[in-house]
Amino acid sequence: MARHAIFQALPALLAFIQTASSTPLTFSTLYPRNDSQIVWPTEVSSLVHDKSWASFGEKTTRWSSYKSPTFDEVFLPETEEQLSLALEYMSGNNMTWLAKSGGHGYAPSLHAIQDAVLINLENFNYVKLQDDNTAVVGTGVRFSDLIDTVAAAGRELSAMLGGGLGRLQGLHGLTSDALRKVRLALWNGTIIEASNNVNPDLFWGIRGSGQNYGIVIESTYETWPATNGGKHYSADLVFTKDSVQRVMEITNELTAGGLDEKLAVLMFFALDATTSQITVIVNLVYSGPEEEGRKYTERFSSFSVDLQENMLGWEELPTKTVHGLIPQSCATGPRYNLRALNTKVLNPATWVSFTDAFETFLVANPLAAGSAMMIETFPVQGVKALADDYSAFPHRDHFENVIESIGSYTDDSVADAVNNFFAEWRDKFAEPSSSGYDKLYVYQNYANEDEPLSALYGYNEWRHERLTSLKNKFDPRGFFNGYHPVPSNVAGWS
């Protein structure tokens, strides 16, 4: 079986999201914007473009058009001084903005941002490897550029603001755990740093809820020597839907005592356009010798219909695993309606039922045939090695399997059907008898808008109090309320 005709759209990895927005709803009611008085400062006016600009669409298009924000102007700063000046000006005139790096930031709550200024940060596109083996990363860098630079130096990094899951988290923890400091622009243009030594309270909050406080301009990350000389064993296995129960049983066996810290498992469910049946691709990556990785592949290969094995460089994993189909998921423009949750186990009976229902749904709704389901089963040793209160990331004990459904379509006639189907199945997967957890836990970068905020940021009252305090301190007027906003009062958590 070659490249398959199955994935018309695949989920994005959402691996380096730095989104910040302004939706000062209460503030704008008190101090409404007066467009007749808006005249950009001369220092930045040449960097601001309206819809008549030929490149306006290119510079404002986002990965998903589902409940997306809209823009009247785009601002492309070249220096942090220009960014600072513009923020001071926009906040003073109560203008609404959204900051964009890669444009993969997904949250239906961004729909509240309409007729705004898009701050396109593509000019902050640099990676600098330091003598101490840290990487200084501009916020405009795409993750592919980052990993190429780091890998060329014989180093590696976990695959920030929402946490940062990745295949190497068993060895190195989350991407946000590798963060050492950031430079941040606040709502009024003030530029500050945050680290364990400077603004440590803000640094704590950035690592798990960072879209709420400002615009990250630059980040400094720790890197590590490349594992196994930079080579990773990868196996792509293809299964028909009648193998789903066995696939889940084996995966549960692998995770029961703790998944090998060097092993990562990804699964994709999608409709084969030729057979009109669900096909499942399982990708195994072992960050070690081929012979050790193959021991895990042999658990699955006897009942797979196709197997492809490779030794890949770390920098090749995002583009050459899963038959090289993942880059196609970065296509911009379609509606991508996501539902997600974390589970302790993968209940075989529930997944068999889902697979049958998913196939029936896609056949009945061909306009949504590009939809997919993804499961990321990554090791958690590095994640759990840090204390629960190490950062604002709340799921260190609830991160065995991260499930993400991606409803993909371009015709809104199927919007309600897609939304209802995946919301219903998210709730079924979240039932304790299926998930193995007593509550709903959701990785923030994959969240929709119908989950309780505690599912994203943690159920502990001390977390609510600490996050709300940070919100009031660093974003007192709610200019960064577009992306799963932290409440400005503790009562808002309920």
List the predicted regions and their residue ranges.
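Soluble FAD-dependent oxygen oxidases
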Residues: A2-R3, L13, Q18-S494
